[in-house]
From Swiss-Prot:
Record-listed E.C. numbers: 2.1.1.242
The protein's role, per its UniProt record: Specifically methylates the guanosine in position 1516 of 16S rRNA.
Record flagged with keyword Cytoplasm: yes
GO molecular function: rRNA (guanine-N2-)-methyltransferase activity
Gene: rsmJ
Name of the protein described by the UniProt record: Ribosomal RNA small subunit methyltransferase J
Catalytic activity reported: guanosine(1516) in 16S rRNA + S-adenosyl-L-methionine = N(2)-methylguanosine(1516) in 16S rRNA + S-adenosyl-L-homocysteine + H(+)
Top EC class for this record: transferase
Claim: S-adenosyl-L-methionine is one of the keywords in the record: yes
Disulfide bond residue pairs: none
UniProt cross-references to Gene3D superfamilies, sorted A to Z: Vaccinia Virus protein VP39
GO CC entries: cytoplasm
Organism: Acinetobacter baumannii (strain ACICU)
PANTHER family per the UniProt record, alphabetical: RIBOSOMAL RNA SMALL SUBUNIT METHYLTRANSFERASE J
Family, similarity comment: Belongs to the methyltransferase superfamily. RsmJ family.
Length: 279
């Protein structure tokens, strides 16, 4: 089990969730129930005859489900998990020269990097593959458990297992964790921020998402509502700048600057950009 820094859930409301499962997966469902309960989530186990697309369509409320591929988040006829194994083709194409994120975060120097806005962990997975030591921070107990499950599956994969020891999952509030790093003067080279809700461009127009990303984000938005509580955006930038000399912020290409702060440098791609803040 990954590290619990003690502050992961103290600002979250009480959570209750169903876990749907076929009878063959009852033991796994009970395991997830116990893990989530230890993180403040009350889980109701719901055995069903068949967990399929029809069942998901008929049960549109936000829930969890368990099958041979582990733990999933489901709603509105869709299901989603971080699924790190699906990222293998992308990783095999990646290199320090080809990836813009590698240049922005100086991954060739094998930095110690805090990803303070974990999401599905795909960027951290890429950065760990390219050599970084990653501290992946997430405070929502359900999303953290989904990430933990994806890492456990990755550790059993011949390709991914080669660098899983470079990813440390931390069940913590990112703001509190950055403050802790500042107080303890721990060595971190880079803080990486990819806020979940940068939905506006420089003209305050809504930014469109690709279909697959939109599908994943729809479910994450249901789990992490955009009410200011879960949007770990603007306030993290100032905290991060106190901790490290290099803060990298990922943004949609035409999005406004995080916290309205102009970066010192930018790397521009077709769909996104990386804004750098140096101290």
């Amino acid at each position: 089990m990954e590290k619990n820094c003690g502050s992961g859930q103290n600002k979250l409301k009480a959570l209750r969730m169903h876990i749907y499962f076929e009878v063959d997966f009852q033991e796994q469902a009970q395991h997830y129930q116990a893990v989530l309960y230890s993180r403040g989530v009350t889980v109701d186990l719901q055995p069903i005859e068949k967990l399929n697309a029809r069942f998901l369509r008929l049960n549109p409320d936000l829930a969890l489900c368990v099958d041979e591929n582990g733990l999933w988040l489901s709603a509105n006829g869709m299901k989603m998990q971080p699924d790190w194994k699906a990222e293998i083709p992308r990783l095999k194409r990646a290199s320090l020269k080809s990836e813009m994120i590698a240049r922005a975060c100086q991954l060739g120097e094998k930095p110690v990097l805090v990803d303070a806005t974990a999401g599905l962990g795909h960027d951290s997975l890429l950065m760990a593959y390219l050599g970084a030591q990653i501290q992946l921070v997430e405070r929502h107990p359900i999303l953290f458990t989904l990430l933990e499950d994806s890492k456990a599956q990755a550790q059993r994969d011949p390709f991914l297992s080669q660098f899983m020891d470079r990813i440390q999952l931390l069940f913590a509030d990112s703001a509190s964790y950055l403050q802790q790093l500042d107080q303890e003067a721990k060595t971190v080279d880079v803080v990486y921020l990819d806020p979940m809700f940068p939905q506006r461009d420089q003209n305050q127009q809504a930014i469109k998402k690709q279909a697959q990303v939109k599908k994943q984000m729809q479910l994450l938005h249901l789990l992490l509502p955009e009410d200011g509580e879960m949007d770990l955006g603007d306030h993290l930038l100032e905290l991060a700048k106190k901790v490290v000399k290099r803060v990298i912020v990922k943004r949609p290409r035409h999005a406004i600057f995080l916290a309205n702060q102009e970066p010192a440098h930018q790397w521009q791609g077709d769909a996104c950009r990386f804004d750098a803040y140096f101290q």
